[in-house]
């Protein structure tokens, strides 16, 4: 039986810790301005899909952030191992969160409707 409460709790802890690690431990300029928005865990806690956003809308900055996060994965996992009491630290997969951009686009469309 899968304990969804534990999965969600571990996901929230990983989200909090990864945000803190990116701010304090990772010195790569490519990941400056990256914010972790959500973490989805696999049922056995072996894989964590980490969703992130970046302040810039430029495609080149998004690509650089993705590369920077992939390069920093080892450091992030090591720090997670120090800070979390888990049997095995999950493998991390970083995915750009498109939901904020989508929401901004809808807000803009609604504002344009109000003007007309």
Swiss-Prot record:
One of several proteins that assist in the late maturation steps of the functional core of the 30S ribosomal subunit. Associates with free 30S ribosomal subunits (but not with 30S subunits that are part of 70S ribosomes or polysomes). Required for efficient processing of 16S rRNA. May interact with the 5'-terminal helix region of 16S rRNA. PROSITE patterns: RBFA. This is Ribosome-binding factor A. The keyword Ligase does not apply. One of its GO terms (cellular component) is cytosol. The gene is rbfA. InterPro entries: KH_dom-like_a/b, RbfA, RbfA_dom_sf, Ribosome-bd_factorA_CS. Coiled coil: none annotated. Keywords: Cytoplasm, Ribosome biogenesis. One of its GO terms (biological process) is maturation of SSU-rRNA. One of its GO terms (molecular function) is ribosomal small subunit binding. It is found in: Cytoplasm. It holds the Pfam family RBFA. Monomer. Binds 30S ribosomal subunits, but not 50S ribosomal subunits or 70S ribosomes. Its main location: cytoplasm. Belongs to the RbfA family. The keyword Cytoplasm applies.
